[in-house]
């Protein structure tokens, strides 16, 4: 099972604002230290920034980007800017080193995760407003028995190499009717890309409570509250958004993904604050995992290169690490 939200979801609006502030920091310094928390909704936007370069003097620029991303002209900005903690700042004086403690992993995305991400992106292209989507593979024993009720025994069902499990798909999309959604999204095309028959959707629910508008006057958004949507089964601890690349939550998670995509394997890692190198296990869930070590400076550079490739921290925050494959 997997849940994906689009960039107009209130929590993603908070992530995007945090990302835009990190972009601002990188426009001021080549290697800034910044951490941002955003809480937004019902006419208020509360932001706390710990930074080496952003101060209260940047309030006008921050208000401008808040209005642009939230699409709210009348919003009250409560901004607090503080300097980074001295001990944390000293950790980065001589060279870039691990900025925090953490465990990290990359799990190769499932068909469900990739499929739903592309469904979400297809809908967002047509209806760029608040949306949330859920897919569930109905594979419990009771469902299997019902699906193969003509079989002689459940034993035969369980040993089938590729049982055709049915799916349940829920689409909650604001500002669109059921008919509009079904007409606008290339649902059959996306299914064909992933080899999924449309007949496998035993349940398809669109806006279970009816037409809705969503947005920041219905729900409140907070930074890093949709990590499941951003990372799928790769979620461990810290958040991806509102942080510079000295933070392991950003850099090591991205590097795990880059290694995982290169080797087509699951990857794990851990590090402690101040570490100059990070050790990885490529294929950590296999019998003979491959050990790999990389300097933190190289990891941070690779992560920043990736962020720049997708268009910056604000663009990265739109979809997280699960960004979809359809073009």
Language-model features, listed with the residues they occupy:
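N-terminal, positively charged regions that mediate nucleic acid binding
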Residues: 1-35
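Short glycine-rich or small-residue beta-strand-to-loop segments that form or flank ligand, phosphate
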Residues: 1-8, 37, 44-53, 101-109, ...
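Short, non-transmembrane amphipathic alpha-helical segments
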Residues: 17-25, 59-73, 186-197, 251-263, ...
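Short edge beta-strands and adjacent turn/loop segments
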Residues: 30-45, 149-163, 265-281
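Glycine-rich, mobile lid/loop segments that gate access to catalytic sites or pores
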Residues: 40, 44, 71-217, 318
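Short, conserved charged micro-motifs
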Residues: 55-62, 177-185, 288-294
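C-terminal catalytic subdomain
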Residues: 225-267
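Internal helix-turn-beta structural module
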Residues: 264-327
């Amino acid at each position: 099972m997997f849940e994906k939200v689009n960039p107009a979801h209130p929590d993603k609006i908070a992530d995007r604002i945090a990302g835009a502030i990190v972009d601002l920091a990188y426009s001021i310094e080549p290697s800034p230290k910044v951490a941002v928390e955003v809480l937004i909704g019902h006419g208020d936007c509360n932001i706390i920034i710990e930074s080496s370069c952003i101060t209260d003097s940047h309030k006008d620029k921050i208000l401008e980007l808040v209005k642009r991303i939230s699409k709210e002209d009348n919003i009250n900005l409560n901004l607090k800017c503080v300097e980074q903690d001295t001990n944390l700042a000293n950790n980065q004086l001589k060279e870039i080193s691990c900025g925090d403690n953490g465990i990290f992993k990359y799990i190769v995305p499932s068909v469900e995760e990739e499929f739903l991400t592309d469904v979400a992106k297809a809908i967002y292209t047509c209806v760029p407003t608040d949306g949330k989507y859920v897919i569930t593979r109905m594979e419990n024993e009771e469902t299997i028995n019902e699906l193969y009720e003509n079989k002689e025994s459940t034993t035969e069902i369980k040993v089938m190499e590729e049982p055709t499990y049915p799916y349940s798909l829920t689409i909650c999309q604001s500002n669109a009717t059921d008919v509009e959604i079904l007409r606008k999204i290339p649902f059959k095309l996306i299914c064909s890309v992933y080899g999924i028959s449309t007949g496998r959707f035993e349940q398809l629910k669109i806006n279970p409570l009816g037409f809705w508008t969503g947005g920041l006057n219905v729900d409140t958004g907070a930074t890093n509250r949709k990590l499941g949507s951003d990372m799928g089964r790769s979620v461990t601890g810290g958040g991806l958004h509102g942080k510079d690349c000295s933070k392991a939550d950003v850099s090591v998670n991205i590097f795990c993904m880059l290694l995982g995509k290169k080797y087509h394997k699951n990857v794990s890692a851990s590090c402690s604050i101040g570490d100059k190198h990070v050790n990885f296990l490529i294929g950590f869930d296999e019998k003979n995992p491959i050990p790999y070590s990389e300097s933190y400076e190289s990891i941070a550079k690779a992560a920043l290169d990736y962020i720049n490739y997708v268009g910056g921290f604000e663009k990265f925050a739109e979809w997280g690490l699960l960004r979809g494959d359809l073009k």
